[in-house]
Amino acid sequence: MFADKPTLQGDRVTLRPVGPEYADDLFELVTDPEVRRLTGSHGEFDREASRHWYATRSQHADRLDLAIIANGAFVGEIVLNELDEGNLACSMRIALIGARAFGKGYGTEAIDLLLRHAFTTTRLHRIGLEVFAFNDRARHVYKKAGFVEEGVQRDALLWDGEWHDAITMSVLRPEWRPLHGSLT
């Protein structure tokens, strides 16, 4: 379903297929302490393993990994993964690199571009995600993009000795409306 790896152009951001040219940027992203907290990532990351991982993303037709570029610089990644073709569903995740990306509308526009692509060029019916309850900024952006809270996974993350809930959200094709412009 995601064999085509498009470049998607918005007003402020461009989404480009992840490849080896973004390996160092992506390694910075996955090792950033705030990104690790917001995504609940406990594991360690090896630079060479990360380089190989990102160099092979274009070979997978069951996922779409896109770098978020603003003003010519890498500011994050957005991904459709965990494809369930039988149910026309997948998951979405997004991560932005701190101060150079937060609060500038890059995430909102990236999500809008990705949802527009997914719902107008594929047969997907449902796109879901999980977000930790403490991440109010992300929850607000997801709701603005059309995601609806479906449930709570209690005590889903143990971080610095404290338990945190995860919120399950999704957007369905019939409910989705683009934030900017029309579907035509």
Language-model-detected regions and their locations in the chain:
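Glycine-rich acetyl-CoA-binding "A-motif" of GNAT/NAT acetyltransferases
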Residues: 73-76, 137, 163
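Acetyl-CoA-dependent GNAT
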Residues: 43-100, 117, 172-176, 183-184
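Conserved active-site tyrosine of GNAT-family acetyltransferases
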Residues: 142, 147, 169
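Conserved catalytic-core motifs of GNAT/GCN5-like acyltransferases
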Residues: 18, 128-131, 148-165
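Short glycine/proline-centered loop/turn elements that form peptide/ligand docking sites
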Residues: 107, 111, 134-138, 155-160
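A short, well-structured alpha-helix characteristic of acyl/acetyltransferase catalytic modules
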Residues: 1-52, 174-184
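Conserved acetyl-CoA-binding loop-helix of GNAT-fold acetyltransferases
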Residues: 97, 103-117, 139-144
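Conserved GNAT acetyl-CoA-binding A-motif
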Residues: 120-130
